[in-house]
């Protein structure tokens, strides 16, 4: 059975604004990140050399991304959907085969904290 976790957060912005803000936020959260010609961002993360690439479709609210570090690789679906005057950001985390259940749970906890910080930053420039 595949182990997954879902992170959901309401953001006090409309979908398009939230989408643009998340895209613009990545290089601010990770100042040493550099984008390569193939669309991959490279940086040193908590688990060593890391890369991330966004596969996006703004009109559909799709902001999926691939993340690879020295310990694991992730395909992360992310959706931004309308919720009245707000937007709902939904992130689905599937346990990579390389990680134990314990390691996955630890990573999910860190990602949840990052998502909480991201929400505060996204809403702070309203």
Where are these regions (language model features)?
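Short beta-strand segments that buttress and anchor functional surface loops
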Residues: 40-46, 63-69, 93
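A short, structured loop/turn motif at beta-sheet edges
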Residues: 12-16, 55-59, 80-88
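A general secondary-structure signal for short beta-strands and their flanking turns/coil
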Residues: 2-4, 60, 73, 86
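Hydrophobic ligand-binding cavity/cleft-lining segments
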Residues: 1-37
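Short, surface-exposed coil-to-beta transition loops
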Residues: 4-6, 47-51, 72-77
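Hydrophobic pocket/interface hotspot
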Residues: 18-22, 54, 89, 118
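Short, charged/polar surface micro-motifs in flexible loops or helix N-caps
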Residues: 47-50, 56-62, 70-71
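Beta-strand/loop substructures that line and gate deep hydrophobic ligand-binding cavities in soluble
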Residues: 66-126
């Amino acid at each position: 059975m595949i182990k997954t976790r879902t992170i959901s957060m309401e953001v006090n912005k409309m979908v398009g604004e939230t989408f643009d803000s998340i895209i613009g936020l990545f290089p601010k959260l990770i100042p040493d990140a550099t984008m390569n010609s193939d669309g991959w961002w490279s940086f040193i993360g908590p688990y060593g050399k890391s890369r991330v690439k966004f596969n996006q479709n703004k009109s559909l609210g799709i902001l999926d991304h691939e993340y690879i570090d020295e310990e694991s690789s992730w395909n992360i679906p992310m959706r931004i959907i309308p919720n009245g005057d707000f937007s709902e950001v939904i992130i689905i985390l599937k346990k990579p085969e390389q990680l134990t259940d314990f390691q996955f749970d630890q990573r999910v906890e860190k990602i949840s904290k990052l998502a909480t910080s991201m929400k505060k930053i996204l809403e702070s420039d309203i």
